[in-house]
A protein has these predicted regions:
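Short beta-strands and strand-loop turn motifs
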Residues: 56-57, 78-81, 105, 292-293, ...
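Anion-binding alpha/beta catalytic cores of soluble intermediary-metabolism enzymes, centered on
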Residues: 124-330
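Short, well-structured alpha-helical segments in soluble
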Residues: 42-50, 93-96, 234-240
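ATP-dependent carboxylate-amine ligase catalytic core
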Residues: 1-89
Length: 330
């Protein structure tokens, strides 16, 4: 959307009565919408905001309106009937929330001219903005993800939300009747989700044979492999290994070690990587940061630290970060 033809209009010291925000949108050649109609949370608004140039009538809650403008990456306009000092403080607060502030006006007539002076506005990174970016990226990829912890209500609720948003193809591991019952009790629609009972699936025997072959040098027998495949993390990892899923999301009810161990035994590390590591993606101060390694290697060697830095930078780049690496004190 264009910064010169989009804006979010909020008020202070007055209401929206007598302000023709819709006509302002028409003058700018933009779509008009009311923030209240788009949702009650920033993540809802980010999904439902109209495409292209848009003029939004805010809620009148200046704090929320400023956060919405920052998240959407559109200029923030304040229509004020308050004392100058109050307006100045409100604008300063809006800037502190990341909003690109155009100014405070007594009516909308001066807004188009003020917007013309704005060169460009980019969305300020926040948890909601990052979530939308991730969902958009996942939706474009159309990946098939296996969720091994089907007994966890959070997994069922997350699966329902992902299916409603058409984000990915999903497989849940668990007893089909139990998963269906939990979904019904939670009011979650799992239409389109594949549910595999890993304990009774014919895939279990195939996976056991493959695992026994992979681990035969470690002395793993077929009978031991069959027992191993009763573990949802191993079964799900074998699905990824065999190309039956593109990825696995685990850890809701298991430790990091329990989740990583099957991958290390079956899939191994990427070419050029000798050590397993992790990164944490965190939104702070309007930016997206990647921290690695905070979970796997408590006392890495100098060589391992260097390798972790390189691998972490490559992973960060996949999430839109232009990586500049800083080595923190260990």
């Amino acid at each position: 959307m264009s910064s010169q033809n989009s804006a979010l209009v909020s008020v202070i010291g007055r209401g929206f009565d007598g302000l023709d925000i819709a006509s302002l949108a028409t003058d700018l050649g933009a779509t008009f919408a009311q923030l209240d109609d788009l949702g009650t949370t920033l993540d809802q608004i980010l999904v439902t905001v109209p495409e292209g140039d848009v003029v939004l009538q805010g809620t009148g809650v200046m704090d929320f309106d400023a956060k919405a403008a920052a998240a959407l990456g559109i200029p923030f306009v304040l229509i004020s009937n308050a004392p100058q000092r109050t307006s100045d403080l409100a604008l300063a607060h809006a800037r502190s929330l990341g909003a690109e502030v155009v100014g405070a006006f007594t009516d909308v007539a001066s807004v188009p001219g003020a917007l013309a002076a704005i060169e460009s506005v980019a969305p300020v990174m926040s948890a909601e903005v990052f979530q939308k970016q991730l969902l958009d990226q996942a939706r474009a990829a159309g990946a098939h993800i296996v969720l091994p912890q089907g007994e966890d209500d959070r997994i069922i609720e997350a699966a329902g939300a992902l299916m409603a948003g058409k984000v990915a193809k999903l497989t849940i591991l668990g007893d089909e009747a139990d998963v269906a019952k939990r979904a019904e009790l939670l009011g979650v629609d799992l239409t389109g989700v594949d549910v595999i009972d890993h304990l009774n699936s014919p895939l279990a025997e195939e996976f056991a044979a493959d695992f026994a072959e992979l681990r035969k040098k470690k002395g793993v027998t077929l009978e031991q492999a069959r027992e191993t495949m009763k573990d949802v993390s191993y079964f799900a990892t074998m699905m990824v290994h065999r190309g039956l899923a593109d990825g696995m999301v685990s850890g809701a009810a298991h430790t990091t070690a329990h989740t990583i161990k099957p991958s290390f035994q079956i899939i191994k590390t990427a070419p050029g990587a000798s050590v397993v590591s992790s990164i944490f993606l965190m939104v702070m101060r309007g930016r997206l940061w990647a921290f690695g390694d905070c979970a796997v290697n408590p006392n890495p060697t100098a060589e391992q630290l260097g390798e972790i830095a390189v691998v972490s930078a490559k992973t960060a780049a996949q999430f839109g970060i232009d990586p500049r690496v800083a080595m923190l004190s260990y």
